């Protein structure tokens, strides 16, 4: 809407609200500022249209919040006279103080008779006279204060006689304004404007263009696929000029002579009446031409550009050189060209058969358009634009004419300068055609013609304009410069086309076309024969026949989108001077400055003339699940993957050398003479890093580096690493031995003896429990860090006293024998006072301060001659330097009995390094940097021990929080350490309830294996489970479970009743360590858990049978009298908890005391309801004093048997669960015994790995060790595995 000239500057700067008024139909505003002929002007408004000032006094501004002061406030009286529009309808007009008239637009409503909220110019009396347009039709006009007039577009209806629904200005006259009652699509479809196309017109144009030009240029947009590819139209031997010319003529003829063309909002940008500017003068009349800024349709780009003075000033700078053009065919690639000096910001590069033929580009500048022909790898020619004089007589619309001229290969493009929306429509790439319609006939415009000449010259030339500007080729592209080489503007001639799509947390690779440089690429040689191509890539041709977009049945998150319309295959391609062949490794463009490495497995051309290659991606360490934790890895190491996809050929950068090396633990590939190397495959499923045995690339150009190939074959290494009879296990952080016990039981079923040879834990009671159940295990009550130092010292001792045969034998000299001499018999009786102790033997070794003397270091435990064993002492090794024979004897004996492991002589290292710093029950944990917490340092020590001992297999267990805290940095660190040591690795999340337990406890497990061993898979679940809480979404691919749609046969989930219903009734005061069974087992689980050690291990040593077995540790933790009184008040029903105690009310799920009741007091004087239940989780928790129920699954077994914060009460007995009941929930057999106090035994059970889970893992380990589990991520357990004994499963296991 055109505002009066005298506007208040502060209000004029008010922000626009383009969404204040709702509308039921698409808006398309068409405003034309014009000056009528004087002879046709009405007497009421005879002054000429004056030049619009440039000082901003007047602003041509579109707003929904505009208003003017009411006539009452300014002493004026607005009048509206009836005007006949071109459609013969009366239109209301308002006359302002100076006689100027303003068209009323129903899209904008005045508020309280005010114009646009920015003007205080009163509306005075005055009539509105009829104006004759140049088209001979009457149009209603509103006269503004400076005499300018604005036509009202009849496309927008009035609303109840008000200005734009927000105005209270009265509308007078005989008829008032007419309101359109029809809002139908047909009504909109038939509507037209003096400068627009109806939908029918557009449909005719589009149909004509599609029939004649679609075969020449096919527009594709792959944004929906996450990839926008650069596409060159297929080259065909068709006269595109003739096609285009005939298309335009047929389009023009299809328009009715009496029908005015209207721009559709669906194809053109809307006009935004916002601000005014003097853009230049017409040669004919010398009148000012006002222009409007433009709004980008939200249907086209999703953004809105609001006009302002700065925008119009920039347009003014272009002067008469500004041209508008309509494009016949939608452009395929658009790149914004930056503005500098006198260059229009709207200059863009357009490419499409509407203006140019195949392999050509169109450059649009303020003074014309230039067509650029590309032949092979060089620019064929650049044409010269020729400009003609500007004639603005009778200008109402912009038109386009492309016709043959006398010059061969020449095209003439005619443009007219009126409205910038035509140019913006061209730049938006929307199909449109617009002709000038006046008095029933189409008019050809000859205003600013540009003749494009095509030459056969091979030399690139600069473009010289008539005004002295030149287009020269510069290093970064092209530049437009003025005559004095000032104000050079770089022209970005390339379109950023990239293919990026990520879903979930899957690591994928996509190639991205570079934004500021176009690659010159083409295939070399003749296409491969159809027979050879179909033989090598048969699947692609079959895919083409099925017209499918994806190979096979791909999931929605599959990044391997396949191009199906293949035409032919090639063996070589050339990109920017680099020749690529099938099987070559290459750098490939990525996002921003990132480059990727991949192997070319296919070159092909599509039926659209597009050039593609198929790449097999190779990952860097930081591209995998390890992410930032892999920054210290070898930068040249890559990981093979099976991920492939199709990308445009111009994404290739250059060739690179990649070698495959033989995998080996501790490999130091310093002598590899290549850019990159790889020895493992990476798969996102279960974050698997696996030895690459048989590369699956279609073009195998892999080479092995001779400098890093081991001198011994893999078979010989495998034989040396194989363990005769048994696989020795080191159990770190062993606790009572839950993990190693389960591994032994499961591996036995698979036919492998996994023996726990060594165990280390800092808890004395836990070490005693493990020793009680594994008497042949070397159990060390040490810290893991001290144990690592001990291993290093033990290795030195073995090398000195066992492996070094040339070592000189020292004479054992005890302290007293050193003092003895041949004259000792003549010594006096006083010598007996200086008696010295004699070392009889050394019985143990340690590192640290076991005797709490404050002295750290390597120590031996000395048994003194003549003293009892309980009087043995720890002595520093340096104080026993004269006891070399005793040390040699101890080391030799210890080496034979394997009291300590040596590097390379350990079969399995398993353990769960404690991470109290990240435990969910630790309220003071460091969630941002968990590795900096000293309580989380044990995971580093665990990996240090693995790195030193180099076992064949590694199994680490930990809480799920290592994948939650700090984006899973602890889990990524552990995986990174294994991979950096050249171990194969796999990470999974397993739930105890899935393996036959009535407990929902999830833990993270990480497998590791040396390169020449099979990486153990994870066992698939055997039971359904009742889910209690969620798992990390980022690691959802690591949850061990059946895939969707995979057939499964799961047993029913176990509940509490299945596990403990057969145990005898005991009270809170029960203190017997052994009890007889009072009933027979009732479920399969109970029968299995009562099995003897012989039944589960197959060992003949244990002679105990079920009849003589007693029930151990079926006694509860004794709760105090006050808590026992509270427990007795908890009802014996499902869901009962402390809220059932008297004197409580619940409001909004929060518990508080009932003020109407006196608190119940216990005999001790304390209240029945303790105060901590109100502060625990702000009184919202239901866990304090909660009873479990028979049909429930226990969330997890805790280390502290407290009922204050956990649901731990027996369903029908007034006590907490007993030690044996907790052990059963963890899968410990009834024969397994515990040592220590009652609290310590609960703690051992709560810290242990569920035996049923480790048993399933042991089976997977045994199958991998035997070579029966190849490269699968998962393995299916035998039927009834979870609750069957060793003899029962022998018939189903392959041997």
From Swiss-Prot:
InterPro entries in alphabetical order: BAH_dom, BAH_sf, C5-Methyltransferase, C5_MeTfrase, Chromo-like_dom_sf, Chromo/chromo_shadow_dom, Chromo_domain, DNMT1-like
Family indicated by similarity: Belongs to the class I-like SAM-binding methyltransferase superfamily. C5-methyltransferase family.
GO BP annotation list: cellular response to heat; DNA methylation-dependent constitutive heterochromatin formation; methylation
Subcellular location as annotated: Nucleus
Domain of life: Eukaryota
Molecular function GO terms recorded: chromatin binding; DNA (cytosine-5-)-methyltransferase activity; DNA binding; SUMO binding
EC class of the enzyme, as a word: transferase
Highest classification ranks of the organism: Eukaryota, Viridiplantae, Streptophyta, Embryophyta, Tracheophyta
Active-site residues, as the UniProt record annotates them: 915
PROSITE patterns cross-referenced by the UniProt entry: BAH, CHROMO_2, SAM_MT_C5
Protein name: DNA (cytosine-5)-methyltransferase CMT2
EC number: 2.1.1.37
Keywords: Chromatin regulator, DNA-binding, Methyltransferase, Nucleus, S-adenosyl-L-methionine, Transcription, Transcription regulation, Transferase
Domain BAH, chain residue ranges per copy: 578-693
CDD domains listed in its UniProt record: BAH_plantDCM_I, CD_CMT3_like
Chain intervals with Polar residues compositional bias: 61-72
């Amino acid at each position: 809407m055109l505002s009066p000239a005298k506007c208040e500057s502060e209000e004029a700067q008010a922000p626009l609200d383009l969404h204040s008024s709702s509308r039921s139909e698409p808006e398309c505003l068409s405003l034309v500022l014009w000056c009528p002929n004087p002879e046709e002007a009405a007497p009421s408004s005879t002054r000429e249209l004056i030049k619009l000032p440039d000082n901003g006094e007047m602003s041509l501004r579109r707003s929904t919040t505009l208003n003017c002061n009411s006539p009452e406030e300014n002493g004026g009286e607005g009048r509206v006279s009836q005007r006949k529009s071109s459609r013969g309808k009366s239109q209301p007009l308002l006359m302002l103080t100076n006689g100027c008239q303003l068209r009323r637009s129903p899209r904008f409503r005045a508020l309280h008779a005010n114009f646009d909220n920015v003007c205080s110019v009163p509306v005075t009396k005055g009539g509105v006279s009829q104006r004759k347009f140049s088209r001979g039709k009457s149009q209603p006009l509103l006269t503004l204060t400076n005499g300018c007039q604005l036509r009202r577009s009849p496309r927008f209806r009035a609303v109840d006689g008000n200005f734009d629904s927000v105005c209270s200005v009265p509308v007078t006259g005989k008829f008032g304004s007419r309101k359109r009652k029809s809002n139908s699509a047909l009504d909109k479809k038939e509507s037209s404007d003096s400068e627009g196309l109806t939908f029918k017109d557009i449909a005719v144009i589009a149909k004509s263009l599609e029939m004649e030009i679609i075969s020449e240029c096919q527009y594709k947009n792959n944004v929906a696929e996450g990839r926008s590819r650069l596409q060159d139209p297929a080259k065909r031997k068709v006269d595109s000029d003739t096609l285009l010319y005939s298309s335009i003529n047929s389009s023009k003829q299809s328009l009715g002579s009496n029908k005015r063309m209207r721009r559709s909002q669906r194809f053109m940008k809307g006009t935004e009446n916002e601000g005014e500017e003097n853009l230049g003068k017409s040669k004919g009349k010398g009148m000012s031409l006002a222009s409007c800024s433009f709004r980008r349709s939200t249907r086209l780009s999703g953004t809105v550009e609001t006009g302002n003075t700065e925008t119009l000033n920039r347009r003014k700078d272009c002067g008469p050189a500004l041209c508008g053009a309509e494009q016949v065919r939608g452009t395929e690639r658009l790149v914004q060209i930056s503005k500098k000096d006198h260059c229009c910001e709207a200059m863009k590069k357009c490419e499409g058969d509407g203006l140019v033929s195949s392999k050509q580009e169109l450059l649009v500048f303020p003074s014309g358009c230039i067509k650029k022909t590309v032949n092979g790898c060089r620019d064929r020619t650049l044409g010269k634009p020729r400009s003609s004089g500007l004639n603005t007589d009778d200008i109402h619309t912009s038109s386009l004419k492309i016709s043959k001229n006398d010059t061969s290969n020449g095209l003439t493009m005619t443009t007219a300068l009126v409205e910038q929306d035509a140019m913006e429509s061209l730049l938006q790439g929307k199909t449109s055609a617009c002709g000038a319609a006046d008095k029933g006939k189409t008019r050809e415009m000859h205003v600013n013609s540009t003749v494009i000449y095509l030459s056969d010259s091979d030399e690139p030339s600069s473009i010289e304009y008539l005004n002295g500007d030149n287009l020269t080729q510069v290093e970064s592209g092209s530049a437009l410069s003025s005559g004095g080489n000032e104000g050079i503007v770089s022209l970005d001639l390339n379109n950023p086309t990239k293919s990026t799509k990520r879903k979930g947390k899957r690591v994928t690779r996509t190639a991205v076309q570079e934004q500021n440089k176009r690659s010159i690429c083409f295939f070399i040689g003749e296409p491969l024969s159809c027979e050879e191509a179909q033989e090598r890539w048969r699947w692609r041709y079959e895919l083409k026949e099925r017209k499918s977009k994806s190979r096979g049945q791909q999931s929605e998150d599959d990044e391997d989108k396949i191009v199906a319309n293949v035409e032919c295959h090639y063996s070589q391609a050339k990109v920017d001077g680099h020749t690529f062949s099938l099987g070559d490794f290459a750098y490939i463009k990525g996002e921003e400055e990132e480059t990727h490495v991949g192997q070319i497995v296919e070159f092909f051309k599509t039926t659209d003339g597009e050039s593609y290659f198929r790449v097999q991606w190779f990952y860097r360490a930081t591209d995998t699940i390890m992410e930032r934790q892999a920054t210290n890895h070898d930068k040249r190491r890559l990981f093979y993957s099976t991920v492939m996809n199709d990308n445009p050929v111009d994404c290739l950068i250059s060739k690179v050398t990649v070698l495959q090396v033989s995998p080996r633990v501790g490999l130091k590939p310093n002598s590899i003479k290549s850019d990159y190397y790889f020895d493992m495959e990476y798969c996102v499923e279960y974050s698997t890093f696996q030895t690459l045995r048989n590369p699956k690339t279609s073009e195998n150009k892999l080479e092995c580096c001779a400098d890093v190939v081991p001198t011994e074959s893999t078979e010989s290494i495998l034989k040396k690493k194989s363990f005769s009879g048994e696989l020795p296990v080191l159990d770190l952080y062993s606790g009572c031995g839950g993990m190693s016990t389960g591994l032994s039981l499961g591996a036995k079923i698979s036919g492998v003896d996994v023996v726990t040879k060594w165990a280390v834990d800092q808890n004395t009671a836990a070490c005693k429990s493990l020793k009680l159940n594994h008497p042949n295990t070397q159990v060390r009550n040490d810290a893991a860090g001290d144990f690592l130092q001990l291993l290093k010292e033990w290795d030195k001792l073995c090398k000195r006293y066992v492996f070094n045969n040339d070592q000189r034998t020292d004479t054992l000299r005890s302290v007293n024998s050193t003092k003895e001499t041949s004259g000792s018999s003549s010594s006096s009786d006083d010598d007996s006072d200086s008696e010295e102790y004699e070392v009889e033997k050394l019985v143990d070794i340690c590192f640290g301060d076991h005797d709490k003397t404050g002295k750290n270091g390597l120590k031996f435990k000395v048994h003194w001659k003549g003293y009892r064993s309980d009087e043995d002492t720890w002595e520093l090794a340096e104080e026993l330097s004269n006891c070399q024979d005793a040390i040699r004897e101890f080391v030799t004996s210890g080496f034979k009995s394997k009291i300590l492991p040596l590097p390379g002589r350990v079969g399995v290292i398993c353990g769960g390094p404690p991470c109290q710093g990240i435990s969910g029950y630790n309220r003071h944990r460091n969630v941002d940097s968990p590795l900096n917490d000293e309580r989380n340092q044990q995971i580093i020590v665990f990996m240090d021990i693995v790195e030193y001992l180099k076992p064949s297999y590694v199994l680490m267990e930990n809480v799920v929080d290592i994948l939650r805290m700090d984006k899973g940095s602890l889990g990524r660190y552990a995986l990174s350490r294994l991979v950096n040591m050249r171990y194969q690795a796999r990470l999974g999340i397993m739930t105890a309830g899935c393996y036959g337990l009535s407990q929902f406890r999830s833990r993270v497990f990480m497998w590791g294996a040396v390169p020449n061993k099979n990486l153990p898979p994870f066992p698939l679940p055997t039971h359904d489970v009742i889910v209690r809480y969620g798992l990390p979404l980022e690691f959802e691919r690591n949850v061990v479970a059946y895939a969707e749609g995979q057939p499964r046969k799961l047993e029913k989930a176990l509940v509490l009743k299945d596990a403990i219903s057969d145990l005898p009734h005991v009270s809170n005061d029960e203190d017997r360590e052994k009890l007889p069974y009072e009933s027979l087992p009732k479920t399969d689980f109970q029968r299995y858990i009562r099995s003897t050690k012989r039944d589960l291990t197959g060992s003949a040593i244990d002679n105990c049978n079920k009849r003589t077995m007693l029930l151990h540790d079926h006694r509860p933790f004794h709760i105090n009298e006050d808590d026992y009184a509270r427990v007795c008040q908890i009802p014996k029903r499902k869901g009962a908890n402390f809220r059932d105690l008297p004197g409580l009310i619940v409001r909004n799920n929060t518990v508080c005391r009932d003020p109407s009741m006196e608190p119940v007091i216990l005999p001790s004087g304390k209240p029945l309801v303790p105060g901590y239940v109100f502060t625990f989780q702000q009184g919202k928790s239901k866990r304090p004093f909660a009873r479990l129920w028979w049909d429930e699954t226990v969330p997890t077994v805790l280390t502290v048997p407290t009922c204050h914060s956990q649901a731990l009460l027996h369903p029908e007995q007034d006590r907490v669960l007993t030690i044996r009941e907790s052990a059963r929930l963890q899968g410990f057999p009834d024969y397994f015994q515990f040592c220590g106090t009652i609290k310590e035994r609960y703690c051992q059970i709560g810290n242990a790995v569920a035996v049923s889970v480790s048993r399933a893992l042991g089976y997977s380990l045994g199958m991998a060790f035997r070579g029966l589990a190849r490269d699968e991520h998962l393995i299916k357990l035998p039927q009834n595995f979870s609750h069957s004994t060793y003899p029962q499963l022998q018939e189903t296991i392959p041997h």
